[in-house]
Amino acid sequence: HAGHVQQDPLRWGWPAWPKAYQDISSPEVTAFCTEQADEVSFYLWLQWLAYCQFAECWHTSQHDAMPIGLYRDLAVGVAEGGSETWCDRELYCLKASVGAPPDILGPLGQNWGLPPMDPHIIVARAYEPFIELLRANMQNCGALRIDHVMSVLRLWWIPYGETADHGAYVQYPVDDLLSIMALESQRHRCMVIGEDLGTVPVEIVGKL
């Protein structure tokens, strides 16, 4: 990403890269990783540094006997042109975006520009993507806030290029997802906090 942005600031993410680089498995991507191994390693090192610093903050909070310590946040989605969609295009529905339906405060609804996970793929993979997501975000913290927790029940999908009022709800396997969340919460000794602002269905309130 850094290399493409240096060449052209308009290459905001992999959908705007030259076609040969849009497929993570392409020979061109493999060649780039080989030829620019030091550059790739540098950015991996930066990620490792950030992880170590975060972990050190968590250990300090535990040493100081803070009841919760660090409180992390799990976003409702990922960037359209980010690494998640580039690495696993099957998991995300790139022809849709999530958002919120029209309501009193927002008559036109909201389009957040985030591609949703495909619930059928999540189930087909035995929930592995959801489990890995929770495990990665429950490390080094005492609490995890789930942004738009209604997403485990349903998400407002908007066809790509349409406005939010043309969307529809897509259902997710809520009971399975909440059970997995409870299990990982126990395993990681991590409190879960669900953010339930906006249009909140009565079903999710009872299940939470």
Give the location of each predicted region:
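Alpha-amylase-like alpha-glycosidases and glucanotransferases acting on alpha-linked glucans and related
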Residues: 1-55, 77-208
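Active-site pocket-lining segments that scaffold enzyme catalytic pockets across diverse folds
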Residues: 48-63, 67-69
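Ligand-binding beta-strand-loop-alpha-helix segment within the catalytic cores
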Residues: 73
